[in-house]
Design a protein with these regions (language model features):
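C-terminal and inter-domain tail/linker signature
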Residues: 1-123
């Protein structure tokens, strides 16, 4: 990643802190500290999320972070950098041991393995 501009390096460091806060620490306040002053989160499968710091914190603390299975694994396959954004391709793997309405709305925990690819582009 030596070819990144200083701004892109800062974006990457912030993104890494953010995903660590989400998937390792599972800490809404630490994740929120990596976001803009007026964040917006939308979980596409369910249409849930939050707007503004209060709304995003509530979504993270009540619907998202506590509903991440303990064996959740996020593996980065590639990152593409634009001037002001990162597009990242992941493989996500977990055992469906929790109801995850933010990702699988209305699907009760099945105990089955789940593996899928995801392209994410935080704005």
């Amino acid at each position: 990643m030596n070819n990144l501009t200083p701004y892109q390096q800062t974006m990457l460091a912030t993104w890494q802190q953010h995903t660590y806060a989400e998937f390792v620490l599972k800490d809404a306040d630490v994740a929120l500290a990596t976001m803009s002053e007026n964040p917006y989160v939308l979980a596409i499968p369910s249409g849930t999320g939050g707007m503004g710091r209060i709304g995003v914190r509530e979504f993270y603390a009540s619907q998202f972070l506590p509903k991440i299975p303990p064996d959740f694994d996020l593996t980065s396959l590639s990152q593409t950098f634009g001037y002001d954004r990162i597009v990242e391709e992941f493989v996500i793997r977990f055992t469906h041991t929790l109801d995850m309405d933010w990702m699988l709305p209305g699907v009760r925990a099945t105990g089955r393995r789940v593996d899928f690819a995801l392209v994410h582009h935080p704005v």
